[in-house]
Amino acid sequence: MARFVVVALLVQLSLFGLEAIQHPPKIQVYSRYPADNGKPNFLNCYVSGFHPSDIEVDLLKNGKKIEKVEHSDLSFSKDWSFYLLYYTEFTPNEKDEYACRVSHVTFSTPKTVKWDRNM
């Protein structure tokens, strides 16, 4: 019985220590296909390597939140860091600017990464 209690305590302590770890997300913004003005495409924001899992991701068009956005399920890597993909259909043109805004406990203010049509 004492062995079980010790093992249970060690498991709880290791899980508690995992919550103390914080890693900022890596943010990548890209289109599914090469940008071609006037042709439908998909805008992707891949957020990876972050911990803890609480995160807020918004896709932006000219600084305003895009409402019709889908995302993958929250998943984790071998190192227990998390990753997500947010995406939406869009039609690129010369005048509109697209970006991904991420809020995470590791950032003092939300971080915004602009889409570079040449990437």
From Swiss-Prot:
Component of the class I major histocompatibility complex (MHC). Involved in the presentation of peptide antigens to the immune system. The keyword Disulfide bond applies. It holds the Pfam family C1-set. Keywords: Disulfide bond, Immunity, Immunoglobulin domain, MHC I, Secreted, Signal. Residues 1-20 form the signal peptide. GO terms for biological process: antigen processing and presentation of peptide antigen via MHC class I; immune response. The keyword Signal applies. GO terms for cellular component: extracellular region; MHC class I protein complex. Heterodimer of an alpha chain and a beta chain. Beta-2-microglobulin is the beta-chain of major histocompatibility complex class I molecules. Disulfide bonds join C45-C100. This is Beta-2-microglobulin. It is found in: Secreted. Residues 25-114 form the Ig-like C1-type domain. SUPFAM superfamilies: Immunoglobulin. Belongs to the beta-2-microglobulin family.
